[in-house]
Amino acid sequence: MKTKILFFLFFSTFSFSIFAAPITIAIDPGHGGKDPGAISRNLGIYEKNVTLSIAKELKALLDKDPHFRGVLTRKSDYYISVPERSEIARKFKANYLISIHADSSKSPDRRGASVWVLSNRRANDEMGQWLEDDEKRSELLGGAGKVLSHNNDKYLDQTVLDLQFGHSQRTGYVLGEHILHHFAKVTTLSRSTPQHASLGVLRSPDIPSVLVETGFLSNSEEEKKLNSQTYRRRIAYMIYEGLVAFHSGKTNTLVKDNLVQNIKQNDIKKSGKNNRTSEQNINEDNIKDSGIRHIVKKGESLGSLSNKYHVKVSDIIKLNQLKRKTLWLNESIKIPDNVEIKNKSLTIKENDFHKKQNSLVNNTNKDLKKEKNTQTNNQKNIIPLYHKVTKNQTLYAISREYNIPVNILLSLNPHLKNGKVITGQKIKLREK
């Protein structure tokens, strides 16, 4: 019976958002009013103004697409608390929430966009609060509340909430991947994958949410870009493209913003020094890309990279479309493929290479055995032998925290009945 109830709840909770049309996107411009957010160093730009501008551009794009509907958590310069932002999204019955921000750092060299999603720890904390609040729990479960009201089983409530948090986290992560993929067309990425964080605006278990950092206001070049209305529109368009790709699995957007489309290629060429992650690999001089990406460290220069990889400085400049001869810290540089030098180097070191190769072949089994033992030991160091159940925690939450399938946990703990755990209970996570 419990299995049937869980199936009904899972289906009723998640299915309606899939079939609903249009999809409602809650757009949350970070900060506002008395909270300016980050303030840029040179131009004195307020983050709250940048985020509101991008949010309005994104809403305009979504409203032109019949598959989407955009709603704003704030429409002008006024303050909204973090919890209120999620409540506003819920009031509009939003399917997804995108919170827009601009980053800042003490280091003026930090640059790039990133996407953040809810961490497991914050999800577990929030689930405990939702369970203790009867009104919130009833609001969250919606139609499923009638089913649960006849089952005095708190574990069932926990399981449903846990499923919702897990669904929101996974969905938010995939959405974040799509947005980052499109961001890479127009700007540097400070993080190549969505990052997990304990951020209040991502707290809704029923609304998959992502926080988008559009760049660093503390970086002089990104500051100038974010001060441009044209660039803000481009950022909004990349988020829109990410949503379309996430929703349909295609990048064929229905809305074609003429201004964005006309300037897209020209801007990428003009701002090549800012767009190291642009997908332009073809150049006029037919300089081949080796596929190597070098992250610039402190004190490194074009000359030192030239010596390290045995390539010409001019080739590095041309391949990366650099309009300067200085490198930025943490910048990603494409390394050219120099066939002549490569062949010469291979000829000189050919004998040494074969000796090393034979040595590696002879020791393969030994190395594999050592590696396997090392991995096993590392795993034991990372995963404790036991886990003590905290308040409102479920077996599903423990499974997510340690990335151990539920069926494995059940086999290690045969005393568990129907997967139910209680506060303070010790759960075995691995064999000794």
From Swiss-Prot:
UniProt entry tagged with the keyword Hydrolase: yes
Supply the CDD domains for this chain.
LysM (cd00118), MurNAc-LAA (cd02696)
Stated EC number for the protein is: 3.5.1.28
LysM domain sequence ranges? 292-335, 385-429
Notes on the domains: LysM domains are thought to be involved in peptidoglycan binding.
Q: What does this protein do?
A: Cell-wall hydrolase involved in septum cleavage during cell division.
Name the record gives this protein: Probable N-acetylmuramoyl-L-alanine amidase AmiB
**Can you name the source organism?**
Haemophilus influenzae (strain ATCC 51907 / DSM 11121 / KW20 / Rd)
